[in-house]
Amino acid sequence: MSMGGDTTWVGKKPIRRIGGLSDALSIASDLGFAVAPPPSQEELQSFASSNGERGDDLIRVLRELSVVQRKIADLQVELQGRKDDKNVAHLTHVGEMQKKIETLSRITQILKDVIQNKDRIIARLQQPYSLDCIPVEAEYQKQFSELLMKAASDYGALTASVSDFQWSQNFKEPPSVWGEMLRPIPVALASCTRFFEAMSAMRESFATLQELRVGNSAVSLPTTPGGNEMTHRDSDCVTPPQGRIESSFDDLAVHKTRRQNNDQNEEEEEEEEEEDGNNNGNRRLSWPPSVKKSSV
């Protein structure tokens, strides 16, 4: 609403209706305000045409927006599908499936061979060293089995040697590391030597104690014609000391010489006893000198 400027409604007082828009307009006209005229038919048509064009534009934009939304939804679905394919690609890939097929075919072939040769496998398991795989005559099978056993042990030793050789080839440490590794070996050898010497001394002491015990028992026994043989048997049957594990040729020679010395000592003691007995006999048979003089 504007004052003046439009004289169309000037002097025309709108019909006053109580409580309506016309009442307000009439009051405004009384106050001197000019009321805008109602739009004409042309204006209404132009306004409708402009509104129609705007509505068409809005509809077109909405359609384009719906198309874009559909495309976005399709892209989201495709992206999710590609993510799922990436997660299961190692399971559904053509190359992986071919590998699995080859593995299954190989396992199937092995199982078929096992089923076909089950009797032979059972027989070989029951006889681990059967020689049906190598043609050998019956008379040489025992020797061949022993040869195989020896070859197995030699093969184990060869395998250990090969592993040691491989280790020596792969060991590429500097000489300082070699020195650190070889340094404790002399100390260990010295301790082993001392331990061996202590064990040897203890063994000799046990042997000496055993000989003394056997000698005392031999002296306490009465002398009989077969006494020497009995003492020898007793000395031979004595249980060796527990500390002694292995005997060398030197130990055997030492024991032999000791036994010979013991035998000689026993023979000398027997000879002395016989001489004492003879002297006693002569002493009993001889007359005292006083008796001889009286008889004379």
Curated annotation (Swiss-Prot):
* Regions that span the bilayer: none
**Swiss-Prot/TrEMBL GO biological process terms:** cytokinesis by cell plate formation; microtubule nucleation; microtubule organizing center organization; mitotic cell cycle; spindle assembly
Q: Which UniProt keywords apply?
A: Cell cycle, Cell division, Coiled coil, Microtubule, Mitosis
The UniProt entry's GO CC annotations, sorted and at most eight, read: microtubule
Which residues lie in coiled coils?
Answer: 56-83, 253-285
User: Which intervals carry biased composition (Acidic residues)?
Assistant: 264-277
Q: Which region ranges are annotated with the description Disordered?
A: 218-296
Intrachain disulfide bonds: none
Which InterPro entries does the UniProt entry name for this protein?
HAUS2 (IPR028346)
The entry summarizes the disruption phenotype as follows: Lethal when homozygous.
Family indicated by similarity? Belongs to the HAUS2 family.
- PANTHER family referenced in this protein's UniProt entry, alphabetically: HAUS AUGMIN-LIKE COMPLEX SUBUNIT 2
Q: What does this protein do?
A: Contributes to the assembly of the acentrosomal spindle and phragmoplast microtubule arrays as part of the augmin complex.
Oligomer and partners: Part of the augmin complex composed of 8 subunits. The complex acts on microtubules and interacts with gamma-tubulin in spindles and the phragmoplast.
Specify the protein name. AUGMIN subunit 2
Q: What is the originating organism of this protein?
A: Arabidopsis thaliana (Mouse-ear cress)
